[in-house]
Amino acid sequence: MGQKVHPRGFRLGLSADWQAKWFNEKNYKEWLLEDEEIRKIIKNKYYHAGISEIYVERPDAERINITVKTARPGIIIGRKGSEITSLREELERKFNRRVVINIEEIKTPELDAQLVAESIASRIEKRASYKVAMKRAIMNAMRKGAQGIKVMVAGRLGGAEIARREWYLRGRLPLQKIKAIIDYGTATAWTKYGTIGIKVWIYKGDADI
C-alpha cells in the first residue's frame, strides 16, 4: 500500500517554509507547547479573519515574534490598532515575554488552500450542498490562476448512513515533483450527523531551484 507524504513537509526549505523559526534544546518542549497555544488563542479569537498561517520566531528567550497571514487584516488590527494591541498585551501577560505581532495580508484567498478548506467547511456547516461548495471553490481558484486544484471531503456526506469520501480534480497536481509549489490545507465541518473532513491541494506552478 502506498504511503502518503505531507505536501508541505516534502517541500520544506524549497517552496515551503517552517512555521516555527527557532531551536532550543533545553526549552524545546515548553516552547513547542507555547507555540501551539499561541496559534490556538489567535485562531479562536479571530476565526472569521481568514487566518491561513501563523509563524513564530524566537530571537532569544525573552522575545516572541509572531507573523499572522490573514485575508482580513482589519479585523485583527482593529480601529487605530486597538485589537492588535489588546492581543499583544494578552500574550505578554500569559507567556511573560515581549511579543511583537506582524500582519501579512493574503491578496488572493481563493489560492490559499487553508482558507479554501475553511470556506468549504463553513458552507457545509450552513447546510449548503457539499458538491456545490467544492465546485465553487475549484471554479474560483482556477479563475484566479491556479494551475491545478484537488478538493476531497470525507464523512457522512449529505447525512448518509455510511461514511464515504468524494473528490474533484481540475488541472494538474504533480505531487511527486519536489519543485512544484503545492499549497495544502485541511478543515473540519461539524454537522448534526458528525464531522466531515476537508482537504485541499492547490498547484501554483514550479519554484526556481
From Swiss-Prot:
InterPro entries registered for this protein in UniProt: KH_dom (IPR004087), KH_dom-like_a/b (IPR015946), KH_dom_type_2 (IPR004044), KH_sf_prok-type (IPR009019), Ribosomal_S3_C_sf (IPR036419), Ribosomal_uS3_bac-typ (IPR005704), Ribosomal_uS3_C (IPR001351), Ribosomal_uS3_CS (IPR018280)
UniProt xrefs under Pfam families: KH_2, Ribosomal_S3_C
CDD domains: KH-II_30S_S3
KH type-2 domain ranges (all copies): 38-107
Molecular function GO labels: mRNA binding; rRNA binding; structural constituent of ribosome
Role according to the record: Binds the lower part of the 30S subunit head. Binds mRNA in the 70S ribosome, positioning it for translation.
Protein name according to UniProt: Small ribosomal subunit protein uS3
Organism per entry: Thermotoga maritima (strain ATCC 43589 / DSM 3109 / JCM 10099 / NBRC 100826 / MSB8)
Gene: rpsC
